[in-house]
Amino acid sequence: MPVSAVVSPVQAHKTVPCHKWHAELKRHKLPVDEFSWIMYRESKCVAKAVGWNYRGDLDHTACPSGAFHRHRQCHAVKSWDMGLLQINSGHNTLTKHICGASTRSRILLQPSCNLAVAKYLYDRYGLAPWAGNSN
């Protein structure tokens, strides 16, 4: 057998992350192998993850700590990414259409909404919405 065909025990045992979400990914018809890794990179498989994007040279120190609704109103916050696949708050109209509520709410923290919006984006743009990661 050629050396290149040999798979080490470590490689053979490598599992796709975010196993607890695989059924939901399948239900939303998202490719499990790709989106499990994206989900791990973006949120570490945590449905309630929020990532803040700040303006220019500003960062979290320019904002008071506290609840989501207070932090999102901080002058330093440009946008935020929410949920398992870190959907950006700029997708407000789309989120309202698919999930019935604004990105200014916590709707994208619900896995069913987050994955439904991700499915729409994936069907139209492929993996491009997740290609860049500034964090």
Which role does the model predict for each range below?
Residues 24-29, 52-54, 68-74, 78-81, ...:
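Extracellular/mature segments of secreted proteins
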Residues 1-46:
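Export/targeting segments at the very N-terminus of extracytoplasmic proteins
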Residues 14-15, 67-68, 94, 98:
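Alpha-helical context
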Residues 28, 44, 52, 59-61, ...:
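Residue-level detector of solvent-exposed, low-hydrophobicity positions
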Residues 10, 37, 48, 55, ...:
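Catalytic and binding regions of secreted/periplasmic enzymes and modules that target cell-wall glycans
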Residues 58-68:
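Surface-exposed intrinsically disordered loops and tails
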Residues 17-19, 44-46, 62-64, 73-75, ...:
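Sequence contexts marking disulfide-bonded cysteines in secreted/extracellular proteins
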